[in-house]
């Protein structure tokens, strides 16, 4: 039974970040758990620091996967068509060029 409210759509950038995270040995089941929570419209734990981005990325939200300080998920919930759009995953430097 699939009780997800949102259909998950992965961007090319997210897919590349996912492959890199796999190569780096990151905890991919933890990422999958977070995506599943978001798809079911369940709030993430507070240590994930889920927040709205600002500036030219203000339509997206960002969270720290598992509470790690430098492993991020950038996403957008599109309520009009019930899509959870996964924009990217990676470190601040990988995602924002810092």
Task: Show the residue positions of the predicted features.
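Residues that recognize and position ribonucleotide moieties
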Residues: 7-8, 46
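Residue-level detector of alpha-helical secondary structure
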Residues: 30-37, 52
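Residue-level signal for threonine
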Residues: 11
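Enriched for short, Lys/Arg-rich terminal
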Residues: 1-7, 16, 23-28, 33, ...
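A short, surface-exposed loop/turn module that caps and links secondary-structure elements
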Residues: 39-65
């Amino acid at each position: 039974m699939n009780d997800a409210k949102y259909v998950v759509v992965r961007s090319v950038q997210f897919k590349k970040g996912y492959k890199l995270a796999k190569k780096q040995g990151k905890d991919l089941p933890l990422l999958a758990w977070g995506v599943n929570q978001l798809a079911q419209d369940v709030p993430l734990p507070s240590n994930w620091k889920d927040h709205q981005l600002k500036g030219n990325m203000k339509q997206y939200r960002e969270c720290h996967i598992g509470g790690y300080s430098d492993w991020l998920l950038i996403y957008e919930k599109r309520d009009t068509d019930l899509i959870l759009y996964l924009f990217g995953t990676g470190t601040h430097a990988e995602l924002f060029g810092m």
